[in-house]
């Protein structure tokens, strides 16, 4: 399933030429950015029980804390992971770019992110370009072009498995989940998004 807007002529045109436009950039130089939500009520979505027995699991339905995970992914692995309470805004995103992302960048890296308004606040491009890296935005309605979406799937599956119930447990579980992302995983994420390796 995908967004119907991908078939609008203007969006379809941008999507059709995306991979061609990146052909000159080695995959090892591509750095994809995104954020995702996590909370203290995450639990496995399925499980097993002995034949004839019902699977029973407990999930909190009361107060829980929602947090935002932000990171980048490149062929070598996940980088610059941050976790903070609440939703992303432009000020937090710029702080992450300056303090988390930029120290991991090298000259000629190409940072790619979606068109979220918080990704376009003043100072983001300047911070990235200050180290000789470049910035591009994905075509609209194109999460399938972002390998980090597959990384989030793996990380959330790990978080559900660990089932953190406090902020401290969520922080520890997030660290564990990011450490579980291997270069082999990242290769698969890039291939799944149709990038030439």
For each feature predicted by the language model, list its residue ranges.
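Short functional hotspots at interaction and active-site rims
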Residues: 1-197
């Amino acid at each position: 399933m995908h967004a119907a807007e991908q078939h609008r002529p203007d969006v379809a045109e941008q999507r059709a030429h995306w991979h061609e436009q990146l052909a000159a950039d080695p995959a090892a130089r591509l750095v994809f950015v995104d954020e995702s939500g996590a909370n203290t009520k995450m639990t496995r979505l399925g499980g097993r029980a002995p034949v004839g027995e019902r699977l029973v699991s407990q999930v909190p339905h009361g107060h829980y804390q929602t947090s935002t995970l932000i990171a980048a992914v490149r062929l070598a692995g996940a980088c610059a992971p941050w976790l903070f309470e609440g939703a992303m805004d432009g000020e937090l995103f710029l702080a992450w770019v300056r303090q988390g992302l930029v120290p991991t960048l090298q000259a000629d890296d190409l940072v790619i992110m979606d068109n979220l308004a918080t990704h376009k606040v003043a100072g983001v491009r300047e911070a990235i370009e200050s180290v000789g890296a470049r910035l591009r935005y994905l075509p609209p309605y194109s999460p399938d072009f972002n390998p980090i979406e597959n990384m989030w799937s793996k990380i959330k599956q790990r978080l559900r498995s660990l089932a953190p119930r406090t902020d401290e447990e969520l922080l520890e579980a997030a660290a564990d989940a990011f450490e579980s992302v291997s270069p082999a995983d990242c290769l698969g994420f890039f291939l799944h998004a149709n990038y030439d390796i």
